[in-house]
Amino acid sequence: MGRKWNNIKEKKAQKDKNTSRIYAKFGKEIYVAAKSGEPNPESNQTLRLVLERAKTYSVPNHIIDRAIDKAKGAGDENYDHLRYEGFGPNGSMLIVDALTNNVNRTASDVRAAFGKNGGNMGVSGSVAYMFDHTATFGVEGKSVDEVLETLMEQDIDVRDVIDDNGLTIVYAEPDQFAQVQDALREAGVEEFKVAEFEMLPQTDIELSEEDQAIFEKLIDALEDLEDVQNVFHNVDLK
C-alpha cells in the first residue's frame, strides 16, 4: 500500500501553491454539509468529518465560519454530488468527484477536459470497481505497533497500518473514520498529518515519460475545474 500513500503525498506537496483553490473547494463542501443538517459539528456527523479533513489542509477559520454562516442564513444554493469515471493514456484510470449547482455545465467541462488532454470519459462503473473507498490517516510520534495496540484495545479492526519514513499510515473502512480518529486522539495523537477519504487503486501502473506528461496535464485540467473536488487515479507518478 505504500504507493497509495504516495498519492496522498502528491496532493499534500501541491497544497502550498493551490491554497486558494483548496480553500474554495472546502468552503463549498462545508456549506453543503452544514446545509444538510444542523450547522453544528457536534450534532452533524457529516459536517464534523469535513471539518476534520479541512484541519489537515490548514483551512482558515474565517473560511469555515463563512461557509457555516451561509448555511445558517440566506444561502439557498443546492449542490449535487457527482462522480465521473474515465481513462487516460495506456491503461490509466481516473475517478473525478464533483460538487455542483449546474449538472450540465459540470458534465460538459469534465468531458472537455478529458477530450482535450488525451483521455476519454467512461460509463458509470467502468473504473470504480478497480478502486477501494478508504479512510486514511497519517500520524507522527506513534509507531505501527503502538497504533495497532491502540486500535486492538478499542476492538477496531482496520485494513492495514504501515510505516512510511517515520509517518504511521492507517487504512480503514470509510465508516470507521470517526472511530479510528477518536481512538488515536485518546491515545495522545494531537495532530493528524492526513485525515482523508480516498478512492485507492487496487493495482498501480507505471507510464512512460511521454505518457506521464500527458496524464499529468489531464489531472491538472480536471483539478482546475471549479466544480471538481477530487481526482483519484491508478498511476504511480515518478
Swiss-Prot record:
Gene3D superfamilies: 1.10.10.200, 3.30.70.980. Keywords: Cytoplasm, DNA-binding, Transcription, Transcription regulation. Its main location: cytoplasm. It comes from the Bacteria. The keyword Cytoplasm applies. It holds the Pfam family Transcrip_reg. One of its GO terms (biological process) is regulation of DNA-templated transcription. GO terms for molecular function: DNA binding. GO terms for cellular component: cytosol. The keyword ATP-binding does not apply. It is found in: Cytoplasm. InterPro entries: Integrase-like_N, TACO1_YebC-like_2nd/3rd_dom, TACO1_YebC_N, Transcrip_reg_TACO1-like, Transcrip_reg_TACO1-like_dom3, Transcrip_reg_TACO1_YeeN, YebC-like. NCBIfam families: PRK00110.1, PRK12378.1, YebC/PmpR family DNA-binding transcriptional regulator. Belongs to the TACO1 family. YeeN subfamily. This is Probable transcriptional regulatory protein SERP0322.
